C-alpha cells in the first residue's frame, strides 16, 4: 500500500483554498513543507541519528530532545541554510549537534552556531562530535547578559530557543532575537506546548483585512509558521 504524506496533503489542500473575496493567499513558502519533510526523513534514517541516539542513551536523556524534534530542527536548518545561528539552552550539545550537522551537510563551512548555556554544572556541549566542533561558538553565560553586551551578532539568520520555558522568559527571547532576524530569518522554539508564549507571539504578527476579516498578507509580519512535534517555527517578513 502506498504511503500518504499527511503533512504535504494538508498543505496541498490549503494551497487550493481561496478566501471568499476570490483573491488567492500568497503561498511563496509552500514548497518548504516537502523539502523539510524530505530532510527530516533523511536524517531519521541516517547513521548519524543512530549514533546520536546511542550517545544520548549512554549520557542520559534528561533535558534533551527526542528523535522527531531533532529531525525537525535539522531539517529546518538545512532548509534555511543560515550563516549565523544563535541557540539558547545549549546544555550538553544535543540540539547543537543536529544544527551543526545540517550546516555541514549543506557545506556551509563559514557558518557559525553561537550556543548559549548558563548552567555552570552541566557537561557543556559534551555530545557534539569532534568533527562538527569547528563551527561551534560556545558561550557560558546568561543570555540576558550577552544580549546587553556585544558578544552576540546584531544580525542573524536563525534563532533557536531551548532555555528556560517560563512564559515571560520565552516572550523576552522571542522579542530580543526576532529583531535581530532579517527578512526570511527563521525563529524556532522547542517545547512550544509548555506555555502560550509561542502561540501569542505568532498571533501578534498577524494582520487581518477589516472588510473580509481574512489574512492581510501585506501587513502580516511573517511569511510562514508551523509546528511539528514540539518545535514551533516562524519565518519573518520584514517591513517593506
Regions found by a protein language model. Name each.
Residues 59-240:
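S-adenosylmethionine/decaboxylated-SAM
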Residues 1-64:
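Rossmann-like AdoMet
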Amino acid at each position: 500500500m502506498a504511503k500518504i504524506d499527511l503533512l504535504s496533503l494538508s498543505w496541498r489542500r490549503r494551497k487550493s483554498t481561496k478566501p471568499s473575496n476570490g483573491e488567492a493567499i500568497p503561498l511563496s513558502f509552500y514548497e518548504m513543507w516537502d523539502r523539510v519533510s524530505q530532510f527530516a526523513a533523511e536524517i531519521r534514517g541516517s547513521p548519524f541519528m543512530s549514533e546520536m541516539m546511542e550517545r544520548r542513551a549512554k549520557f542520559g536523556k534528561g533535558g534533551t530532545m527526542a528523535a522527531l524534534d531533532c529531525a525537525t530542527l535539522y531539517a529546518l536548518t538545512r532548509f534555511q541554510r543560515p550563516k549565523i545561528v544563535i541557540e539558547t539552552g545549549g546544555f550538553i550539545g544535543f540540539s547543537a549537534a543536529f544544527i551543526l550537522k545540517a550546516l555541514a551537510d549543506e557545506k556551509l563551512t563559514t557558518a557559525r552556531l553561537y550556543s548559549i548555556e548558563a548552567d555552570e554544572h552541566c557537561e557543556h556541549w559534551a555530545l557534539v562530535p569532534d568533527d562538527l566542533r569547528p563551527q561551534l561558538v560556545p558561550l557560558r553565560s546568561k543570555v540576558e547578559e550577552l544580549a546587553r553586551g556585544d558578544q552576540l551578532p546584531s544580525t542573524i539568520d536563525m534563532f533557536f530557543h531551548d532555555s528556560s520555558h517560563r512564559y515571560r522568559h520565552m516572550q523576552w527571547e522571542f522579542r530580543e532575537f526576532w529583531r535581530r532576524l532579517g527578512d526570511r530569518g527563521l525563529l524556532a522554539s522547542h517545547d512550544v506546548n509548555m506555555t502560550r508564549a509561542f502561540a501569542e507571539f505568532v498571533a501578534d504578527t498577524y494582520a487581518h483585512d477589516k472588510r473580509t476579516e481574512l489574512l492581510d498578507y501585506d501587513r502580516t509580519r511573517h511569511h510562514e509558521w508551523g509546528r511539528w512535534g514540539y518545535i514551533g517555527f516562524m519565518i519573518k517578513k520584514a517591513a517593506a
